A protein has these predicted regions:
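Primarily short, surface-exposed interaction patches in extracytoplasmic proteins
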Residues: 19-22, 30, 34-50, 55, ...
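Key residue(s) within conserved catalytic/signature motifs
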Residues: 99
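Residue-level detector of alpha-helical secondary structure
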Residues: 186, 271-274, 291
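Primarily EF-hand calcium-binding motifs
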Residues: 240-251, 270-281
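Long, His/Glu/Asp-enriched segments that create or flank divalent metal/ion-associated functional microenvironments
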Residues: 458, 465-475, 479, 483, ...
């Protein structure tokens, strides 16, 4: 099929089981020829295969494996490598780390970022190792209950404190690629979604609660369902309100202001009380205004079991009770369903084959992970009014993903098998009007990938990176203590280099703290020394000739050999410095600090 002048060779393998047979697809070669890219995937234009370990396993290859791969005459070596990686435990761990970043990068419950990521990551790794389908994973995330330190599937619910509006927004953004939260207070500015549709989605979640577990050590929370209303227990009498008012009115002027309630339970909500009850707009609440405050609606969820759409013209009004309806398909919830039944129904609607957005969101995101940009950008803001690049290809992949039973590995293998993916990554001129996907685009490595790459290049254990000092294991130190040190080092590094994977690549920028870390880290300086038993020292002892040593350093850090011009620059610099060890220290340090090391290039 000829699709807008782009050639990709997208071979879709047959689907196992009762699904249809695979669809072979070849696109025209005109666009690739216009960019002087060999449409048959010539060696000089192909990305070194082992570098793909970063994409699929979050780590760099050993320099020796790069050389062996390039020398291997097997014409199927790339497809074999990809298949081996996708079916490895490292792929499962890599995907778990990716989805950890997706969920927690926008968490509104800050405590979840300290408690949940390791548990979620372990649970998600297990899902991928068991080759769980994407619909089952999402179903578990939407219907989970239990201790957040024990059940990793509670991550999404805990990350947003069980708040219905936040969960509706993130469910749509992550799993459907639609940012329907823009319709929270008004019609969506660019898509057809209406305000009522956002609140109908939120109405699947009002009975979710996140509460602290009593006497739990260490401190923990649990996701539970609250199906019985407690409204009758929460409205104090006018007399009780009068006593509270007089106790808080410290200057006895008959008016409560913010400074007077600063140390009380009302402090967090006082601005909202003013907005709702300050009839004369004098910046305070009289006793009469205080007693007339409307009962809290959605803002005091402890007592609500239904979702209300606020009346924007009457802020003091709780609003209209909304019944659950899934906006993408129109699926409705019957009355009388409890929390778990509602969330299960929502999961069924979200993952249904009738809901095209479920497959579209995952396919678009996966294509972006591997090729640096999606068919629609941003990847979490597609929407029905957006155009996608090469819709025929996109629809083919979405249809195949759906009919395969949402087989994650199959989708990765199909995309990784395209010539667009296997070609050398080439930046595209943003002013170039030609279609995308002649090859993958440069993209910033995730924090885990940089961390693992540094471990490989420096030849150190993960007990050190991210920590202020480099300490080896002390005599008598337990494995558990070492494990905690490794975890702490990675956690600190992720806090410095982490970013939301849903962010478009052009919006991901390095910052000063990251640059200072790479330039000034005592560990990096210590491990790029030419003396002792560092990686660099061993390379220099192994290769007395400078050209071989330069090539080995490039293979170690960038997984490729230097170009002729790079080799000349290195030779000239070594001659200029006059000290072999010092010159190679500068070379290795500069490569570790290069944009190529931090990116897929």
């Amino acid at each position: 099929a000829a699709i807008k002048g782009v050639e990709m060779s997208l071979a879709v393998p047959p689907v196992a089981g009762p699904y249809r047979r695979g669809i072979p697809l070849r696109m025209t070669q005109a666009h690739c020829h216009s960019l002087s890219v060999d449409s048959e995937g010539g060696h000089s234009h192909e990305e070194p295969g082992p570098r793909r370990l970063l994409d699929l396993a979050d780590r760099l290859p050993a320099s020796a494996s790069v050389t062996l791969f390039e020398l291997d005459p097997n014409s199927n070596k790339r497809s074999q490598l990809i298949s081996r990686l996708i079916n490895s435990p490292e792929f499962s761990a890599s995907q778990a780390r990716y989805w950890r970043d997706v969920i927690f990068s926008r968490a509104t419950e800050m405590r979840s970022r300290q408690m949940s990521p390791p548990v979620f990551q372990a649970w998600m790794t297990e899902q991928f190792e068991q080759k769980q389908s994407w619909d089952k994973i999402v179903e578990n995330l939407l219907t989970a209950t239990g201790d957040v330190r024990e059940n990793g599937a509670t991550a999404l619910l805990f990350a947003h404190g069980g708040e219905a509006a936040e969960l509706a927004a993130e469910t749509s953004r992550i799993f459907l690629g639609i940012q329907i939260q823009c319709a929270n207070c008004h019609y969506h500015p660019t898509d057809r979604w209406k305000r009522i549709q956002f609140h109908q989605l939120a109405a699947f979640f009002p009975r979710v609660r996140v509460r602290q577990k009593r006497d739990a050590t260490p401190r923990s929370f649990e996701v539970v369902s609250q199906d019985a209303s407690r409204r009758g227990r929460r409205s104090p009498s006018p007399q009780a309100l009068g006593l509270m008012f007089r106790r808080l009115d410290r200057n006895r002027d008959g008016k409560l202001v913010k400074s007077e309630v600063a140390d009380s339970r009302l402090a967090r909500s006082f601005d909202r009380f003013l907005q709702r009850g300050d009839a004369n707009q004098d910046g305070g609440l009289s006793l009469k205004e205080f007693q007339k405050l409307p009962p809290p609606g959605n803002n005091n969820r402890r007592f609500e079991t239904e979702h209300y759409m606020p009346n924007l013209n009457e802020p003091g009004n709780r609003g209209e009770a909304i019944r659950p309806v899934f906006f993408a398909t129109g699926g409705r919830a019957n009355e009388g369903l409890d929390d778990l039944e509602r969330r299960q129904l929502l999961a069924n609607h979200v993952t249904s084959t009738r809901n095209q957005w479920f497959a579209r969101a995952y396919v678009n995101r996966t294509w972006s992970v591997l090729l640096g940009e999606g068919f629609a950008m941003p990847i979490d803001d597609m929407g029905p009014e957006r155009e996608v690049a090469h819709p025929e290809v996109f629809d083919l992949l979405c249809r195949d993903f759906t009919e395969s039973g949402y087989d994650i590995r199959r989708l990765f293998e199909i995309i990784a098998g395209t010539r667009a993916y296997q070609r050398q990554i080439r930046p595209r001129d943003p002013t170039d009007p030609t279609p995308p996907f002649a090859s993958a685009q440069p993209s910033r490595l995730r924090a885990d990938q940089i961390y693992n790459a540094l471990l490989e290049v420096l030849g150190v254990e993960s007990t050190s990176l991210g920590r202020r000092s480099f300490r080896r294991r002390r005599p008598g130190q337990s494995n558990d203590m070492m494990s905690r040190r490794r975890s702490a080092g990675r956690t600190l590094f992720l806090a410095l280099f982490g970013f939301d994977p849903s962010t478009p690549q052009e919006d991901i920028k390095g910052n000063v703290p990251q640059a200072l870390y790479l330039m000034n880290s005592p560990l990096i300086h210590a491990m790029v020394r030419a003396g002792g038993n560092t990686r660099l020292a061993r390379i220099l002892r192994k290769h007395p000739g400078n050209d071989d040593a330069i090539a080995e350093v490039y293979l170690l850090v960038l997984s490729r050999e230097p170009s002729a011009s790079e080799l000349k620059i290195c030779r000239d610099y070594i001659t200029e410095v006059g000290n072999r060890g010092e010159a190679f220290e500068d070379l290795m340090w500069s490569l570790v600090n290069s944009s190529e090391f931090l990116s897929r290039r």
